[in-house]
Structures are given as C-alpha cells and as structure tokens.
C-alpha cells in the first residue's frame, strides 16, 4: 500500500511526540517512499544508539554474544533482522503498522482509564453503556485487553454492561436480531456475562404496564415541535436511566464510548443552544454530577471516529445489524445534525479542527457552582443569574401569600361580624364550619378549613416550575404543544429545588456572613 492510499487520521499533535522523541523524527523520514512503520524505524534507531557504548561495555557485549553463539549454535539477532511492519494508517501524519498502532491506542486508553480507578488492588465496579455501535464495541474490547494483562499491566475491573432499548422512540430495523447480537457479543466474544436490557419506558416508572408507558412516552415526544428538543430529551432520559441502573447495581462510575468527534459536535451544539456554562464539564474525561455521587467517564475522548473504525475493522468483529431505519439524516434535521455536518466539512479541509476545539475547551474553567441548584431535567448546574431569578420568584410568591393571608383575615373578620360563613353565634345551622367560639374560628382560619387562607395556594399544584430549569431546558419545555405528562424524576427534582430555595430564603436572616466572622476574630 502506498503512502497516498493510507487513511489519514487526526493531526500531528504532542501525543505522538511524547511516544517518539523529536530528536529522532529526522531519522523516521529518511527511508525512500516512507513505506515502513515510523515507530518500528524508531525502535531500530534507538537500538543503534544503544550500541554506542564505552569500550568495556562493547567487549562485554561481544563476549556474551559469542557465548550464546557457542551454546545455541544460532546466529545473533542483528538490527537488520528485526521485522519492520508495513504501515496501515497515517496516525496524525505518522505512518504506523498494525502492531504499533494497536499498542499506541491501548496505551492512550490506559492513561485515561487509570483516572477511573481509585484502588489498584480492589476490583472497581464499572457500568459500561453499550449502544451497539462501533465506539461502544471498541470500548468493551479495550477494557477486555486491560483485564487480560499479566502482572502490573493487568487491571482488576468488575464490568457490568447495560443497553438502553430506545425502540419505542427510534424504531430498530432489526430489533430482535440486534438484541440477540448484543447478548452474544457481550457474553461469548468478550466474556462479560452481566448485560442488562433496560427499556426507555422505565423513565416513567415501573408501576403502570409497559404498553401504557410506551403510549405515554410516544405522546410525550409527539408533543415536541422541534427535532432538536426530541434529541435532547432522549439524551437526558438515557443519562437518567444510566444513573438509576448504576444505583441499582451499586456502581458509582459509568463508562461512555464517546469519541472526540462526538464531543466536538456536542461542544458546538451546546454552545449554540445556550449551554456554554456546562460545556467544560460535559466534554472532559470525567463528567461530574453535582446532584448525585455517580460520575460519567469518557476514556475514548482522544480518539477520532476514523481511528476507531480502522481499529474496529482490523479486529474482524462482526458488524452490528442495522439498528435504525433512518441512518442518514439531512444536515438541517436539527441543530445537532447541522453542527455535525459543519464540523465534518471542516475536518475534511483541516485535520486540526476537532483536536483544536477540544484543546481550546480544556483551557476553559467554569465558575464556582452551588451543588444545591441543578436543572430539574438535565441535572446541570444553574448559573448565578438563574439562581437569583429563582430566589426572586420565591420571594415574590411569599409576599403574595402574605398579602392574601392578610386580605383573607380581614374578610373573615368582616364576615364574622355579619354572621357570615364562619359566624360566631351559637346556633348550629348558621355556621358552615360549625364554629361556635371566636377563638376556635380564628384558630381554624390558619388551618385548611373552607375559609382557610391557604386553601387557594394548596390546590394549585405546580408540576414543573420553569425557574428550576436551565436556559436550554426552558426552551425544550416551551416546545411542548400542551402540558406534558413529564417524567416523575423531573417533578421530584423541581419540587425539591423549590423547597430548598424557600428554606434558604426563610433562614437567610439568621445566617452569619464570613465577613462577620472575620470581624469577630479581629476583635
């Protein structure tokens, strides 16, 4: 294969320079036609440099070689006899053979997977999200190689796999074949027996029958007016199900097979949708979840899609049956597909596009966040402006409730003087609430009676308060054509956030500021 026919992947960044020092890069380009693996040539060049030893060391080495020749009657292995593989890929402008390429991919993967491990001796429980695509399949293959090593190279990992069945929303073309293939691939090929198939309908709970939940889920997505909102809601539901399964299996770490291309698309799409505040966290190797103790890891962040496909092809893994009936969507289908098409065009023009974006986002630092304030739908932290808006709404609601209470108390007092509903007379038929004493009527006005001041507020049950959502999710919630029967976890998160914010608003006058503590210490 000539150098022009080799697939080109990525850019010439510092990763390959860390593997092959810069001072030997001139040696790599010397061969005519560049039809040999660069790393193999580097190994040869490195051996040549090692032979430039002192006279004593050269004599000792010759004596050892002569002894070996006399004992084994074999010719010594020289530098020219070492095999040099044929290049199969231009890995970031460097030509590598399959063995060197496989070794480099595994090395880069281990550097990221080490960040997941907290203990080198105890087996780490990992939950791997298996979608059935190329990236997740390669992720499992690399994890298998990490667990099959010997000695120090072996990692002790307790791997459990989960597949979110989205056939109710995005129908699979060969649903049964896909599920059977995933089970066979996971159990037989890789040897991971723990595979769970979780339907997407479980996001609505498990109390109602599956058919009823399927209809509710379809109706919920049908009410969304834009395809972008449908894709985002599907992503949030999928992540929430992964968190629930992780809690169920007692796994605190979820491993995703997200490639660098997908993260670059997510970076541009999230910024265009107003989610720039959470971009540094969502595109890093470790995704923090402020609302719970589950963390998401993306160890394949450094690999391009083309690099993953070439690795996947050389492993001779059976292809997954076509899962979706529509694979090639139009670029203007949604914001996500539009950003994906835009970045693919830039990547074809310049190989530096994806890695430049990811290196740029690595330099971004999110401001300090309050872990108590998270979006009810996507669980991303709210900005300081959104928190202030939420506190303002709660303060206005409290003021309105106080005004209503005062007005109701005045009306009740007037009605009591006029023998109204809660009359103070001792006749049994003149009082609808059976109040016969002034004290009893005044006390019951503070409770939930027929003339209670809180009756109007208790009956108005708000399912999801828009102020508990981030900017992007507010747009998503606005896209619903009618009030949706949304997932229970969203209502629960919204209610909890409102309660927390209201409690903080009530006790804020009794809290001590840090400035006051400093003044006390100075005195």
From Swiss-Prot:
Highest taxon in the source lineage: Eukaryota
Function: Plays a central role in 2-thiolation of mcm(5)S(2)U at tRNA wobble positions of tRNA(Lys), tRNA(Glu) and tRNA(Gln). May act by forming a heterodimer with ctu1/atpbd3 that ligates sulfur from thiocarboxylated urm1 onto the uridine of tRNAs at wobble position.
GO cellular component labels: cytosol; cytosolic tRNA wobble base thiouridylase complex
Organism: Dictyostelium discoideum (Social amoeba)
InterPro entries: CTU2 (IPR019407), Rossmann-like_a/b/a_fold (IPR014729)
Listed Basic and acidic residues bias regions: 57-67
Record-annotated disulphide pairs: none
Name of the protein this chain belongs to: Cytoplasmic tRNA 2-thiolation protein 2
Region of interest called Disordered, as start-end residue ranges on this chain: 53-81
Family: Belongs to the CTU2/NCS2 family.
């Amino acid at each position: 294969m000539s150098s022009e026919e080799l697939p080109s992947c990525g850019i010439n960044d510092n990763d390959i320079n860390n593997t092959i020092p810069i001072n030997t890069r001139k040696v790599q380009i010397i061969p005519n036609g560049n039809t040999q693996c660069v790393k193999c040539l580097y190994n040869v060049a490195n051996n040549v440099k090692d032979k430039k030893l002192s006279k004593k060391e050269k004599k000792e080495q010759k004596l050892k070689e002569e002894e070996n020749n006399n004992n084994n009657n074999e010719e010594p292995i020289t530098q020219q006899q070492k095999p040099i593989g044929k290049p199969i890929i231009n890995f970031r402008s460097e030509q590598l053979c399959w063995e060197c390429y496989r070794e480099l991919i595994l090395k880069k993967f281990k550097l990221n997977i080490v960040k997941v491990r907290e203990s080198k001796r105890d087996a780490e429980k990992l939950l791997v999200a298996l979608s059935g695509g190329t990236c997740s399949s390669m992720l499992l293959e690399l994890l298998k190689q990490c667990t099959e090593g010997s000695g120090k190279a072996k990692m002790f990992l307790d791997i459990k796999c989960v597949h979110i069945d989205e056939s109710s929303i995005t129908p699979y073309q060969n649903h049964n074949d896909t599920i059977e293939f995933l089970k066979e691939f996971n159990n037989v090929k890789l040897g991971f027996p723990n595979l769970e198939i979780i339907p997407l309908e479980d996001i609505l709970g498990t109390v109602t029958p599956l058919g009823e939940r399927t209809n509710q889920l379809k109706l919920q997505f049908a009410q969304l007016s834009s395809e972008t909102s449908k894709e985002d809601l599907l992503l949030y539901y999928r992540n929430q199900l992964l968190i629930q399964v992780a809690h169920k299996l007692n796994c605190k770490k979820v491993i995703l097979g997200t490639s660098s291309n997908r993260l670059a698309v997510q970076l541009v799409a999230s910024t265009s949708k107003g989610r720039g505040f959470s971009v540094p966290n969502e595109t890093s190797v470790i995704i923090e979840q402020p609302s719970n103790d589950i963390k998401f890891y993306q160890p394949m962040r450094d690999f391009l899609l083309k690099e993953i496909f070439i690795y996947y092809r050389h492993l001779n893994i059976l292809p997954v049956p076509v899962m979706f009936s529509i694979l090639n969507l139009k670029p203007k289908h949604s914001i996500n597909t539009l950003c994906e098409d835009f970045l693919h065009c830039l990547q074809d023009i310049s190989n530096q596009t994806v890695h430049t974006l990811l290196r740029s986002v690595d330099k971004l630092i999110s401001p300090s966040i309050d872990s108590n304030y998270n979006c009810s739908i996507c669980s991303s932290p709210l900005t300081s402006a959104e928190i202030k808006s939420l506190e303002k709404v709660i303060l206005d609601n409290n003021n309105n409730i106080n005004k209503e209470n005062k007005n109701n108390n005045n009306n009740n007092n007037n009605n009591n003087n006029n023998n109204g509903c809660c009359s103070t007379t001792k006749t049994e038929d003149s009082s609808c609430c059976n109040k016969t004493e002034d004290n009893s009527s005044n006390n019951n006005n503070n409770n939930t009676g027929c003339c209670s001041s809180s009756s109007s507020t208790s009956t108005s049950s708000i399912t999801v308060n828009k102020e508990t959502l981030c900017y992007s999710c507010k747009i998503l919630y606005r896209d619903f054509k009618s009030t949706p029967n949304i997932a229970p976890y969203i209502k629960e998160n919204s209610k909890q956030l409102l309660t927390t914010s209201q409690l903080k608003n009530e006790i804020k006058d009794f809290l001590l500021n840090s400035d006051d503590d400093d003044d006390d210490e100075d005195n």
